[in-house]
Amino acid sequence: MLDPRAQTLLKTLIERYIAEGQPVGSRTLSRYSGLELSPATIRNVMSDLEELGLVISPHTSAGRIPTPRGYRLFVDTMLTVEPSADEDAVMRAVKTTLQPGEPQKVVAAAASVLSNLSQFAGVILTPRRSHVFKQIEFLRLSDKRILLIIVTPEGDVQNRIMATQRDFTPSQLVEASNYINAHFAGLSFDEVRRRLREEIDELRGDMTTLMHAAVTASTDVTDTGETVLISGERKLLEVADLSSDMARLRKLFDVFDQKTSLLQLLDVSSHAQGVQIFIGGESNLVPIEEMSVVTAPYEVNGKIVGTLGVIGPTRMAYNRVIPIVDITARLLSMTLSQQ
């Protein structure tokens, strides 16, 4: 544990470095810390913090900058996020953007608003589409061709064209969809397949044929995995901390292109409550030392279905980004739950 004096100086150093992007010297710390300490005393404290691995001194400057470990201590124990007028503006902007509609479009809009408000990259783990259905409907297209319409609990509407061995009348299709909705809604199609095997003797042959065709056609519709949407990644080209080194920049866009590490990070954060902060060089889940990711899970009807976040430099204004992520997650949850 740091003593109060060391905590104050470390907090001041990180706040000044985030604001100005330059190594922080003893004169700046004396001016902004509110402590009446001599330059020699401040330098001694800085030496102690350096030994603890919380700050380092770049070769080109007498000032110091925080390490990933220093940032971790800062966000865990020193960071204060207080309500402000900016938070009201964020709330209005997110509400305006996240209008009820098709869930996938709402989720994509959330990634966009995260990027626009933070001026970094917005990222979102889209929910795994449900293996269960809420409602289905059959529409006759022509002889032996039927449109299968599947509505999932999340509100997604998915269509498949079915080819059948025989023709069905519109009344037969209505009867079949009514039976399936009454007896099987809320189940997975695998469960429907199992139940059909058990109940096959109780059903007419044409009904069984149609339902088996529906189960077969629906398999690839409902079995889609999680995907990562990224918005505004080019904004990071304007962040010197990330774009000044070409090798680092290539690695950054490899992360965006392959998405594997982001998928793993977002999946981990979906199991936690509230805002999580992952700091490069401190978390194995962040592949670039100069990069941080601020995440929060979002819900549908009280159940966590995905994660969203902001990707930016380690030197970001966490007290500004955290409310953006938190508010967006809460309002996205509300919007999706109203579908």
Curated annotation (Swiss-Prot):
The keyword Repressor applies. It holds the Pfam family HrcA_DNA-bdg. GO terms for molecular function: DNA binding. It comes from the Bacteria. GO terms for biological process: negative regulation of DNA-templated transcription. SUPFAM superfamilies: GAF domain-like, Winged helix' DNA-binding domain. Keywords: Repressor, Stress response, Transcription, Transcription regulation. Negative regulator of class I heat shock genes (grpE-dnaK-dnaJ and groELS operons). Prevents heat-shock induction of these operons. Belongs to the HrcA family. This is Heat-inducible transcription repressor HrcA.
